Amino acid sequence: MWIQRDPLGVALVIAPWNYPIQLSLAPIVGAIAAGNCAVLKPSELAPASSAALARCIGEFLDPDAIAVVEGAVEETQALLAQRWDKIFYTGNGRVGCAPPPVVSPTIVARFCDCML
């Protein structure tokens, strides 16, 4: 078996409020394992989990490889306006299935796991 790691660059992970730790860390682990850097935006609806993730990731992981941005809709929109090589979104179908112009026009890949 041949495995070739081909990092994409910087991934944005927008995580949901239900299972906030697991659904935040699973895509982050995959992104980092593949050689990418990642930015995590945990749900504002789980503030204790969001704060714990920000504290632990900031304390124990390389800040050059992974960052956490806490906030609500305004912060999420600001993140989506940036250039990303991959966006991994888990959450509401209304938001996740938004037309591509809502996100950065330079996006290479977008993965949405939505509940419709």
Predicted regions: what is each one?
Residues 1-116:
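Rossmann-like NAD(P) dinucleotide-binding subdomain of oxidoreductase/dehydrogenase enzymes
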